[in-house]
Amino acid sequence: MKRVILLAAAAIALAAPALADDCTITVGVVMGLTGPAGEYGQAGAKSVEMAFRDLNEAGGPHGCKLVADTRDSQSQGSLAVDAANQLVQLKNVPVIIGGIISSVSIPILTSVTGPGKIVQVSPASSSPTLTNLGRAGKTNGMFFRTITSDALQGTAAAKYALDQGFKRIAVIHVNNDFGVNMLAEFSKAYKALGGEIVSVSPYNEKQSSYDAEASKGIAANPDGLYLIATPVDGATIARAWISQGGPAKFLLNDGMNSPDFIASVGAKYLNEAYGTSSGTSPTASTEYFNANYKAFSGGIDPSTPAADRAYDAGAIVGLAIAAAPTQDPVAIRDAIFRVTSKDGEPIHAGKADFAKALDLLRAGKPIRYEGVIGPVSFDRYGDITGPFRLWKIVDGKVTTVGEMSTDDVNALKAKIVK
């Protein structure tokens, strides 16, 4: 076991030998701890650390200790690629978990993990481009993600928007792969269901002002604004929209499910703010995570986007390392399917169940990891399915008001195609 393991999720660098005499398995984490997606990356990195702590307390894979080597991508694809290359080329890592946002995960995949046949697991990148790369044979079957694709979420958002009275909508979206694809999927469904998009304004991250984008959207006389953004830029855009007299009615993407966004904009302006997120099917893991994460993370709310899914990404990787006969990337990839087997023994988060899992894996038996987000099962492209959470901001808090199942969304998509 002379390999280091990288989890892509950029943050702090913890240099450690690949496998020291004390049997330490170093796992690299590349997540954006700073930049527009810094809130997600900080939550995700802590979640991976928590999963590793639980696995270590259970005995560790092959009796070894998992340690995270975390690097900060600053939410930038080029920096993430540099970090991933260093970890793969200099430390010979077989796995990368990350990034958080699609505009970071995609360049890691196309530049490093795909060509190099290195396992990559993202906890939060939802762009349909990642599925398309798999279909085109560009991932070599090495990519996985613990979040549903925007190909489904865009349809769920369109139906929810119309149900909440958004008949004419303006759109302001981040000008990257995530924003462009989310808008494309939403637009197809929204128009087919009878909605009208009256204005579209892409924006670049970290602009000094978003007044022009807000002004353009308001001039089109919409019922409200569909804001596809990250919390920092999204709050600035929302404030510009409100200050210029735009209707205080918002449709928000999953990443805007953020206490920081609400605090920055002001809860009193968000009484008609609605959103969709990749949902969960609650299990014992969900209860465990929600009860323990805040204390472990130093106060981060367990509902922070990417927190739950990053724990599951870390747990699945750690269990796959334990299940694999060697630390070869292909062996770990194959083991991911064994630890999420529909025929396996159900395993939940935490020390006790992880100890049970390690015993079963040593005996050569499959397990079914039922994670914080629910039972996890990957298809041939590394995608998962799951419900979509429908939420509304009520008294300054994100409140679940409904759910759309994957079957509901697929039925709606089929109807739209016809």
Which role fits each region the language model picked out?
Residues L14-A20:
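Sec/Tat signal peptide C-region and signal peptidase I cleavage site
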Residues K2-A8, A20-K418:
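Extracytosolic ligand-binding ectodomains
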Residues A8-L14:
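Hydrophobic alpha-helical targeting segments used for export or membrane insertion
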